[in-house]
Structures are given as C-alpha cells and as structure tokens.
C-alpha cells in the first residue's frame, strides 16, 4: 500500500509549456439596438402632391395675400369668406366688369375661394405664409421650373447637360492617365535608387511616348464640336460608303447565286444516284398504213404448180436461214414487251404482226413463232399436235429424203361431215398387223371424200339418154354425191385457216419435198379439215404474198 499524498500535484503553467495565451474576446456592443433607435428617431417625411404644386403656382401668380385679396382677416370664419367672395364676384364678373383683365381676376378669385373654403388647403396656405415657397435648395424648385418649360427649352437644357458631362468625362480620363503615369514614374525612380533590377530601355521609350501623347482636353473636344466634325467626315466619306455598300451587295448576290447553283447540282447528283434504272423512252409508233396494191403485179394464175412449188421451197429455205442467222435470243424484257404489244394490238387489227415486229425490232416470222411457242407452252388444245414435237420430227426426218410415213404420235384426228370413221390404208400384211397392234392408240379417221372416191363406181357411157339416166339409181346417187362434195369444198374454202393449220401445212411441205409421189394427198392428210384443193389454193396464196413482199422490199 502506498502512502496518501499530503499535497496535490501541480500542473505546469501555460508559459512553462511555451503556449501563447488567447487574446481576450472583444467587448460586444449592442449595435442592433443602436440601429433600431436610429430608425425610430427618423421623423416621417411628407412628399409633395399635385395640390401643393398648384398652390405654389397660384401664390406666385397672384403675388398678394389671399385674405387681403378678399378683404377679410386671417382668422375670419368660412361664412365671412363666403360673403366676401359673393361681393367680389358681383363686381369682378366679366359680364359686369369691362376691364381687360376681368377674366384673369375672376379666375384668381375663384381659385382663392377654393383654397380658403377647404380647411386642409387653408392650413397649407397658412404654412406657406409663415415658411415661404421652396427655394433652390429643394428639388421641387427645379421640378416646378422644368414643368413650365417647352420642348425646345427642354432639348436645349438636355444638350447643355450632356455637353458638360462629356467634357467632365474627358477631363477625368486625362487626369486618370496622368495619375497612372505619375505612379509608374515613381515606381521607376524607386527601382533606379535601389538598383536591384535593370530597367528596360524599351519600356522607358514607351513611357516617354505616352507622355507626349497625353494632352489636355481642348475646345474641339466638346460634344458640339465633336458632333460637327463627325457630321462633316460622314458627308465626305458618304460616296465611298455607298460604293462599298454596292460592292458588298454585289458580292452577296454572287454568293447567293453560287449557293443556289451548288444546291441545284447537289439535287441533280442525288436524283441521278437515286435513279437506279432509267426507263427507256417509249418509241413513237408510226401509224400503220397498208401497202397499196396498185403498184404490185397481180398473181398470174396461169403459172404451173411446179414453178409455184420451186418458189415456195426457196422461200421456206431462205426464211429458215434468216431465222437461224438473224434471230437473237429472247430475253425476259423482250417477252414482257411482246405480251404488252399483243394486248395493245389485239386480234383483228390490220397488220397486227407487222406492228408488233416493228415495236420489238424483229422480223415478223420471229415474232409469230415466239408467240406460237408461248401459246403452246401455256395451253395445248385436245386433238392437236404440239409444234415442238412436229419440229423435232421434221428435223430428224430432213437428212433422210425418202418418203416416210408419219408416226402414230403425230397423226391428228378429225371427223368428217357425216361422222363416219375409217382406218388408213396400209400396204400389205404389215399394215394389218400394225392396225391390230395399235387399236388402243388414237387412230386417224379417213376423210369421207377418199371413201367416196374408192366406193364410187366407174362412170358409164356419156351417151346414155337423159331419160334413162333419170330412172337409173346409180346415176342419181352419183349426182347427189357430187353435189355433197361441192358443198363440202365450198364450205371448207369458206372456212378460214387457223395458225395451227398454217403451221401444219408448212411442216408438211418441208416433210414431203417436191418430186415425192402423191405429195399433195399426203399434205392434205396432215392438215385437218382441209382438202387437197384447199391446200393447193393456200399454197398459191402464200406464194403470191411472198412475191408481194419481195416486190415491196425491192
């Protein structure tokens, strides 16, 4: 156990520790209370009103005491003032007073009565009598003077004030520069005395120039002189200013035009870039006029069939050669143009295929063959043979110039007028075997005219009497058969040739060349519903058309 301390331990003082004592806080004075007392001690001020200004003007105008003007005492009652006003109004009224100043005197009388009959305004007038009017030390004095000035006087006063203010500003600028120069000079002198830093020679030269430039304001620095000098200089420089303005306007116009041209070129370039594909201009189609046949030699019907066959064979060979050489390939655009032209020139229009060929820039044969191919590819009528099959058979049969029979696939079916069907004549036993083997396949019906020709009996002697002929049944049947044949030929001649029949005729002419046996009979068998005479007549017509085309080209 430790013994208890007899004396408490003493801490070292602040000075022993080396600490600086804090300064005592400053005494707090009640500044807020002082400000409040000052504000409360300020007396309320009263501003001047329009009534006061009118009263000041009336006092200056009358130049007399209002009580003396009415002839009453200053402490008179309102009744005494009213009586005095009535008496003076009877004497000073303009109708009874012939004096020149009667109107002004009567107006002053009314104004004095209006002031004295009101207690408040009378009290203000009594204060003016004691204290007098406001003097130059009060702002209302100048305000009253300015109110009475005209516009010209106000403008002159304002101009004088501005002139004085401008001159004072000029002097203030001069004095400020002088002060700056003086301070800078003192600094330079101090630097020279101390010698701590070298003084720059260029700065000294600049300070000397500034001293020379500093000049006291002269009379021509006044505002009126400055305005006059500025006006003269503007008049002198006015032509140059106008010229500069014209040049500036011309440059502005040129820039605007250039901007417009640039904008147009940009828009054109943008449109050209946007146009990916330029549409072809539609050609102007000439009005089709059929060729006049007056200058074309008519067909000589006296020519032999051999000459006609030679001409037709030459024409077919030339047409095939030109088609192989000149016919370009058909593109999708050409096909679409062909369909549009076929819609534009429907069937029945004169010179339809010539117009379509002129529009496409191709030959008539090329256009017709392509149109036929399109029709065959879309639809194929029952009972007819496809042109592609016929062409393939023709091309395969060309190198072999021997007369061969058509295969069963290419044999067309047809019905005669009476609806009687007969099998084709076959040579020998092989024909009978083929007919037995091909019963399931489509079989060609034999025309009625061939049956009639085979079943027809040989003509008897022409010297038989007419009476006996009338009673002969065979002769009557023969005459009726001849009439029916004539009617059928006339009907078939009247029927128009279709495109399929025309194509079959052309293919048959190529398949059975000139010199083959029974050529026209075989050709007539290939063309449905057409006889041998019809095929020959059509052949002659085609030859005539070829001759006309050759003459037209030459």
UniProtKB/Swiss-Prot annotation:
J domain span: 65-129
Side Cytoplasmic, residues: 175-554
Domain SANT: 325-379, 492-547
Region named Disordered: 392-500
N-terminal signal peptide: 1-47
Modified residues (Phosphoserine): 381, 430, 479-480, 484, 492
CDD domains xref list: DnaJ, SANT
Record field: compositional bias (Polar residues): 392-405
UniProt GO molecular function: ATPase activator activity; DNA binding; protein-folding chaperone binding
UniProt subcellular location: Endoplasmic reticulum membrane; Nucleus membrane; Microsome membrane
PROSITE patterns attached to this UniProt entry: DNAJ_1, DNAJ_2, SANT
An example Gene Ontology biological process: regulation of translation
Assembly with partners or alone: Interacts (via J domain) with HSPA5. Interacts (via cytosolic domain) with ribosomes. Interacts (via SANT 2 domain) with SERPINA3; the interaction delays the formation of the covalent inhibitory complex SERPINA3-chymotrypsin, but does not alter the catalytic activity of SERPINA3. Interacts (via SANT 2 domain) with ITIH4 (via C-terminus); the interaction protects ITIH4 against in vitro cleavage by kallikrein.
Biological role stated in the UniProt entry: May modulate protein synthesis.
Protein name in the entry: DnaJ homolog subfamily C member 1
Organism: Homo sapiens
Gene: DNAJC1
């Amino acid at each position: 156990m430790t013994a208890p301390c007899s004396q408490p331990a003493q801490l070292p003082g602040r000075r022993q520790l080396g600490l600086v004592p804090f300064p005592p806080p400053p005494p707090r004075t009640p500044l807020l209370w002082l400000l409040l007392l000052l504000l409360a001690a300020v007396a309320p001020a009263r501003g001047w009103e329009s009534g006061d200004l009118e009263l000041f003007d009336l006092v200056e105008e009358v130049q007399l005491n209002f009580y003396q003007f009415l002839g009453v005492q200053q402490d008179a009652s309102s009744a005494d003032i009213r009586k005095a006003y009535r008496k003076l109004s009877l004497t000073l009224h303009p109708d009874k007073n012939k004096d020149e100043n009667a109107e002004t005197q009567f107006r002053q009388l009314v104004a004095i009565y209006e002031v004295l009959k009101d207690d408040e305004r009378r009290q203000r007038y009594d204060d003016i009598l004691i204290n007098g009017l406001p003097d130059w030390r009060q702002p209302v004095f100048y305000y009253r003077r300015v109110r009475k000035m005209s516009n010209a006087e106000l403008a002159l006063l304002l101009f004088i004030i501005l002139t004085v203010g401008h001159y004072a500003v000029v002097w203030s600028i001069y004095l400020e520069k002088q002060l700056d120069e003086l301070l800078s000079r003192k600094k330079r002198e101090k630097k020279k005395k101390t010698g701590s830093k070298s003084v720059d020679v260029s700065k000294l030269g600049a300070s000397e120039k500034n001293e020379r430039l500093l000049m006291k304001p002269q009379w021509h620095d006044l505002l009126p002189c400055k305005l006059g000098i500025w006006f003269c200089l503007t008049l002198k420089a006015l032509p140059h200013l106008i010229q500069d303005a014209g040049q500036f306007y011309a440059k502005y116009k040129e820039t605007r035009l250039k901007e417009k041209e640039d904008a147009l070129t940009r828009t054109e370039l943008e449109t050209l870039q946007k146009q990916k594909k330029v549409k072809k201009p539609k050609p102007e189609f000439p009005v089709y006029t059929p060729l006049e046949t007056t200058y074309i030699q008519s067909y000589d019907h006296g020519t032999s069939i051999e000459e006609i066959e030679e001409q037709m064979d030459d024409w077919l060979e030339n047409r095939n050669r030109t088609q192989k050489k000149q016919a370009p390939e058909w593109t999708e655009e050409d096909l679409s143009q062909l369909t549009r032209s076929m819609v534009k020139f429907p069937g029945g229009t004169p010179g339809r295929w010539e117009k379509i060929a002129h529009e496409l820039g191709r030959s008539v044969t090329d256009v017709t063959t392509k149109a036929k191919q399109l029709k065959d590819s879309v639809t194929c009528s029952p009972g007819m043979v496809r042109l592609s099959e016929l062409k393939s058979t023709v091309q395969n049969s060309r190198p072999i110039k021997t007369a061969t029979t058509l295969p069963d696939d290419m044999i067309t079916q047809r019905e005669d007028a009476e609806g009687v069907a007969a099998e084709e004549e076959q040579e020998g036993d092989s024909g009978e075997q083929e007919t037995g083997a091909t019963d399931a396949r489509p079989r060609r019906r034999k025309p009625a005219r061939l049956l009639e020709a085979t079943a027809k009996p040989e003509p008897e002697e022409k010297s038989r009497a007419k009476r006996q002929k009338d009673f002969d049944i065979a002769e009557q049947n023969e005459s009726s058969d001849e009439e029916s044949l004539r009617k059928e030929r006339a009907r078939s001649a009247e029927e128009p040739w279709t495109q399929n029949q025309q194509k079959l005729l052309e293919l048959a002419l190529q398949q059975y060349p000139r010199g083959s046996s029974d050529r026209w009979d075989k050709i007539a068998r290939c063309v449905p519903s057409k006889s041998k005479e019809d095929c020959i007549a059509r052949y002659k017509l085609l030859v005539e058309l070829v001759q006309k085309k050759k003459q037209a080209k030459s």
